[in-house]
From Swiss-Prot:
Membrane topology: Single-pass membrane protein
Function: Confers resistance to heavy metal ions (e.g. cadmium (CdCl(2)) and copper (CuCl(2))) by chelating them at the plasma membrane of root cells, thus stopping their entry and reducing their accumulation.
Pfam families: CYSTM
GO cellular component: extracellular region; plant-type cell wall; plasma membrane
Name recorded for this polypeptide: Protein CADMIUM TOLERANCE 1
Subcellular localization, as worded in the UniProt entry: Cell membrane; Secreted, Cell wall
InterPro entries: CYSTM1_HM_Tolerance, CYSTM_dom
Keyword Transmembrane: yes
Family from the record: Belongs to the CYSTM1 family.
Length: 55
């Protein structure tokens, strides 16, 4: 699949941004929503992504 970053860890926001760039906004929003659904909380990144899709 994807190689892990070698020198630094990718943050959650960076990961969502990468998905947005590679697959588009809708895919990034679904990815973010499913991630928050799995951890049972809404994070700031989820809200930013949803606002991005609604704009």
């Amino acid at each position: 699949m994807y190689n892990a970053p070698s020198a630094q860890e990718m943050s959650y926001s960076d990961h969502v941004q990468r998905r947005h760039e590679e697959k588009g906004c809708l895919y990034a929003c679904v990815f973010t929503a499913l991630c928050c659904f799995c951890c049972y909380e809404t994070c700031e990144c989820c809200l930013d992504c949803l606002c991005c899709c609604c704009s």
